[in-house]
Amino acid sequence: MGARKKISAEKRKEALKTMYFAKLQNVPTSPRKMRLVADMIRGMEVNRALGVLKFSSKEAAARVEKLLRSAIANWEQKNERKAESGELFVTKIFVDGGATLKRMRPAPQGRGYRIRKRSNHVTLFVGSKSNNEDQN
């Protein structure tokens, strides 16, 4: 590894120590459906976001709720204390497209229609309100 590349890798590694996040990969729902849920909680306080997700009727909400609980646990693990009410916020959440499984459905006159079964990756960052303002 080159010297400059090594230095930038070390900087990135140090920056990750102050970030608290959780990732969910290869979720078998379309990214479009997952983004609807992600947009609901972006920027919210974590306890309020958990309440919103708990009472949401969307299937993706249960997965994002579990991911949010994991991110909170990661924050508590790194800081060696419990998170207090109003302290943590969802600073960033984004949904990226994952692998697409392609299937064929029989169609009239000997043709086949392609069905795309999409998946996605969700990344969720939590932090304090001051961290949220610094990152923007």
UniProtKB/Swiss-Prot annotation:
Coiled-coil spans in chain: none
SUPFAM superfamilies assigned to the protein according to its UniProt record, in alphabetical order: Ribosomal protein L22
Function field: This protein binds specifically to 23S rRNA; its binding is stimulated by other ribosomal proteins, e.g. L4, L17, and L20. It is important during the early stages of 50S assembly. It makes multiple contacts with different domains of the 23S rRNA in the assembled 50S subunit and ribosome.
Official protein name in the record: Large ribosomal subunit protein uL22
Organism: Bacteroides fragilis (strain ATCC 25285 / DSM 2151 / CCUG 4856 / JCM 11019 / LMG 10263 / NCTC 9343 / Onslow / VPI 2553 / EN-2)
Family designation: Belongs to the universal ribosomal protein uL22 family.
Record's keyword terms, sorted: Ribonucleoprotein, Ribosomal protein, RNA-binding, rRNA-binding
Gene name per UniProt: rplV
SUBUNIT field: Part of the 50S ribosomal subunit.
A single MF term (Gene Ontology): rRNA binding
Ribosomal protein among keywords: yes
Matches recorded under Pfam families: Ribosomal_L22
CDD domains the UniProt entry points to: Ribosomal_L22 (cd00336)
PANTHER family associated with the record: CHLOROPLAST 50S RIBOSOMAL PROTEIN L22-RELATED, LARGE RIBOSOMAL SUBUNIT PROTEIN UL22M
Keyword Ribonucleoprotein attached: yes
InterPro entries named in the record: Ribosomal_uL22 (IPR001063), Ribosomal_uL22_bac/chlpt-type (IPR005727), Ribosomal_uL22_bac/org-type (IPR047867), Ribosomal_uL22_sf (IPR036394)
Example of a GO biological process term: translation
One GO CC term, this protein: cytosolic large ribosomal subunit
